[in-house]
């Protein structure tokens, strides 16, 4: 059964890539010219290549993707194709894929969609001039982004995400943004760690008619509970 599901998942992804290719001009830097000429690296191949990239150099990744054929596109050809597609194109592909995956798996827990929100740092190429991502730590410092993600627990899929520079990250603002654009009609219960506690976040969730369970900081900390006279026992 697993291989059947994976095959169906691959079909859905390819359909989403085809859909993006049909409207690529909406997400191109130069809509009238980008992705219009026949290239060694087609639009669909470029998308598939990006999704399959691992931790190797671009040159080695290209050779692996094209089975080491002599006709494989050059590194500069890849760079040119990558520049043409705006980030919004990847955002469209992600949300289109998530939506269409619901046709394969749409499990609820007692009638509720269980959502979990958390964040994680990802190191990127060092660039001291990038004020959003450069962290002055150690001898040379480093660059990192913070990925905030909304996860559907029952269906094991990501519903949404928001990327911030680590130096200026704001997890509560990221959650508020994802909650505001959440459009699933199914009743939802959201769970999050104590980094997301705030009255503003509660207001966004209540306005969206979402139930939530958010871990709070201890009453002896500087969190919300510290302003209440609560007993220090069960």
List the predicted regions and their residue ranges:
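Conserved, well-structured functional cores that handle cations and Mg-NTP chemistry
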Residues: 1-234
């Amino acid at each position: 059964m697993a291989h059947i599901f994976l095959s169906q998942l691959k079909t859905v992804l390819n359909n989403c890539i085809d859909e993006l290719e049909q409207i690529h001009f909406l997400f191109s830097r130069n809509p009238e010219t980008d992705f219009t000429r026949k290239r060694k690296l087609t639009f669909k191949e470029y998308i598939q290549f990006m999704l399959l990239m691992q931790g190797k150099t671009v040159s080695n990744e290209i050779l692996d993707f094209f089975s080491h054929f002599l006709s494989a596109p050059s590194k500069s050809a890849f760079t040119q194709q990558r520049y043409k597609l705006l980030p919004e194109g990847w955002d469209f592909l992600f949300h289109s894929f998530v939506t269409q995956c619901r046709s394969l798996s749409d499990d609820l827990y007692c009638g509720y969609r269980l959502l979990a929100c958390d964040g994680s740092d990802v190191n990127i190429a060092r660039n001291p001039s990038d004020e959003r991502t450069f962290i002055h730590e150690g001898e040379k410092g480093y660059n990192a982004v913070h990925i905030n993600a909304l996860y559907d627990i029952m269906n094991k899929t990501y519903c949404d995400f928001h990327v911030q520079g680590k130096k200026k990250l704001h997890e509560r603002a990221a959650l508020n943004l994802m909650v505001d654009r959440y459009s699933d009609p199914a009743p939802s219960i959201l769970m999050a760690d104590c980094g997301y506690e705030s009255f503003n976040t509660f207001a966004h969730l209540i306005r969206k008619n979402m139930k939530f369970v958010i871990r709070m900081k201890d009453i002896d900390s500087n969190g919300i509970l510290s302003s209440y006279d609560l007993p220090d026992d069960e």
